[in-house]
């Protein structure tokens, strides 16, 4: 289900796991890998392809929520501002949001917009994990350097590769732990 306005968000109150990150960090590839469905979320080499909030129902039990990427995208500023507003409305009002997965490209590390989002989540007490994608594109020393740089912000990132599937089990563990009744 795609939602371009808050009134289009699901109303069935199922728990939600949101995937947030800059344009082209691999959010859709991560979703496809976790869901085990290659074409679930549309992937593209062109930044800014995800332009609505997409809700994917998983086993009838919860939603994966694919949010538009922030940052670089070849679209008019008006569209970027609309996406920003939509994302903010979702994050501010999502009562069933159980976990935010903040996605970083392991080759690039933190950008100011990522740090702003991290602070925003922390200030509101929203649980989150940081996932470092595109791990397969780095050699061993680059992987270590990238992880160290991400850790400097006080978080332990979960490395992930959509090509090899590395890290999928750990991400699923974080998700299922969050969804477990307390």
What spans do the regions from the language model cover?
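Canonical P-loop GTPase G-domain recognition
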Residues: 1-7, 137-182
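Conserved protein kinase catalytic core
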Residues: 39, 72-75, 111, 139-140, ...
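Conserved G1/Walker A P-loop phosphate-binding module
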Residues: 1-74, 180-181
């Amino acid at each position: 289900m795609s939602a371009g306005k808050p009134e289009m968000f699901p109303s069935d109150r199922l728990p939600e796991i949101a995937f947030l990150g800059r344009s082209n960090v691999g959010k859709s590839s991560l979703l496809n890998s976790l869901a085990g469905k290659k074409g679930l979320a549309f992937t593209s080499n062109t930044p800014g392809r995800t332009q609505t909030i997409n809700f994917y129902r998983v086993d009838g039990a919860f939603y994966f929520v694919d949010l538009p990427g922030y940052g670089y995208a070849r679209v008019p500023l008006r569209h970027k501002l609309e996406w920003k507003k939509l994302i903010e409305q979702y994050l501010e009002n999502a009562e069933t949001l159980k976990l935010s997965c903040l996605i970083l490209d392991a080759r690039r590390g933190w950008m100011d917009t990522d740090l702003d989002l991290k602070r925003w989540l922390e200030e509101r007490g929203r649980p989150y994990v940081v996932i470092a994608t595109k791990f397969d594109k780095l050699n061993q020393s680059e992987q270590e350097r990238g992880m160290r740089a991400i850790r400097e912000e006080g978080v332990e990132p979960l490395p992930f590769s959509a090509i090899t599937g590395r890290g999928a089990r750990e991400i699923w563990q974080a998700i299922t732990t969050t969804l477990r009744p307390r």
